[in-house]
Amino acid sequence: IFFRDQKITPREQINFAQRFGEIHFHPYMKGLDDHPEILEIIKEPGDGYTFGSVWHTDQMFNPQPAKATMLYAHEVPKTGGDTMFSNQYLAYETLSEPMRDMLNNVKTFNVGDGFRRGIGKAKRIDRYAKNPTMQAKIRDPGNIPTEAVHPLIRTHPETKRKSLYIGSHTQTLDGFNAEEADSIIDFLRNHSQRHEFTCRFRWEAGSIALWDNRCVQHKALADYDEKRRTHRITIAGEIPM
């Protein structure tokens, strides 16, 4: 869901987000000092790393991932900085029946740090070295779980539709050797990003995007070199089934 021309305070953003459920806190990233529910995502001119620039669903490395995300734009570049979204219902439904049958009971192992498909094995703090503003927000997750096993094919608790549940946090597949798992994951990640499944949102200051992580992947485009500042809130979800 997208909204244009909004003017809301941090407190109003939190109040709106809470209509959809309990606020989910990022285990690795500190929120605003006065509103810790909000993660401020900033890229300054010259920064070489864009937060969220690979296809993913938020907090997939948590045993109870965020079910939804709300992003509010404060400052945006004149061009670029769009966000891509991909429909994972369609990603599942367009797989062949034999492929769906093979994958229906497969589990994925997902990690929050030290490994991301499309980026490599660098630790989060090292990946953010080219974006010192975001690097300064990194914290130790402490006892918060940052590894999780999830079904590869997820059933939405409200719509009851099945979707492909995979992303850059997915490290391997239970029951498959490394070569098999890598081949299947690479195929599914490429399949999940097919052009016909996607839409592209062009940000303006005052825009809000609200999406369901249980059936949607997203990706921030790293095609700009101006300041971009957004406020993100994630909503706590249930254990994927």
Task: Annotate each predicted stretch with a short phrase.
Residues 3-210, 214-241:
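Fe(II)/2-oxoglutarate oxygenase catalytic core
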